[in-house]
A protein has these predicted regions:
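Small beta-barrel nucleic-acid-binding modules, primarily SNase/OB-fold domains
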Residues: 2-7, 14-164
Length: 164
């Protein structure tokens, strides 16, 4: 392959990558969505616009149930059942982003609120003892609150703090 062909191939590759990146829109500061599926205790699939999008709830970490080559962790199935009861498929949501809009898996990162009553889903999962706090910079808006809510659940021995 000549140098000219290598340069041409490089330019085409860069343009293709740029076009693909441009197709991935960040989450606006606030967006309406509807639940399609609950993946596990901290990951859901929603309809955003007309597209299915995977959302990772910011600030919480529920026990694993779907991680490849990883055993189902204590209280993981219960965390999944709990979020299914909070926001079953069809539930209208309001999603709020923080500083960084995607994680290293490409999932959108969001604080999730039920549209009808404003329930802060991330908080409810934490306060009922179905998650541990997970603070990853720069998405730290509620990190102190999550630590407080987890401490409260632990003191009260709710959820995983009692079972595991």
């Amino acid at each position: 392959m000549t140098t000219r062909h290598k340069v041409t191939a490089c330019i085409i590759s860069c343009c293709t990558l740029w076009a693909c990146a441009a197709d991935v829109e960040p989450l606006p500061a606030s967006a309406s969505a509807r639940v399609l599926e609950i993946v596990d205790g901290d990951t859901i699939v929603v309809t955003l616009g007309n597209d299915p999008v995977t959302i990772r709830l910011i600030g919480i970490d529920t026990p694993e149930t779907k991680k490849p080559s990883w055993p189902v962790e204590c209280f993981g199935p219960e965390a999944t059942t709990f979020i299914q009861s909070l926001i079953p498929p069809g539930t209208a949501l309001i999603l709020h982003r923080d500083v960084e809009s995607r994680d290293h898996f490409g999932r959108l990162l969001a604080y999730v609120f039920r549209h009808d009553d404003g329930l802060f889903v991330n908080q409810e999962i934490m306060t009922q003892g179905f998650a541990r706090p997970l603070s990853i910079a720069p998405n730290l808006t509620y990190s102190q609150e999550f630590a407080y809510w987890a401490g409260e659940a632990r003191r009260e021995r709710r959820g995983l703090w009692k079972a595991c």
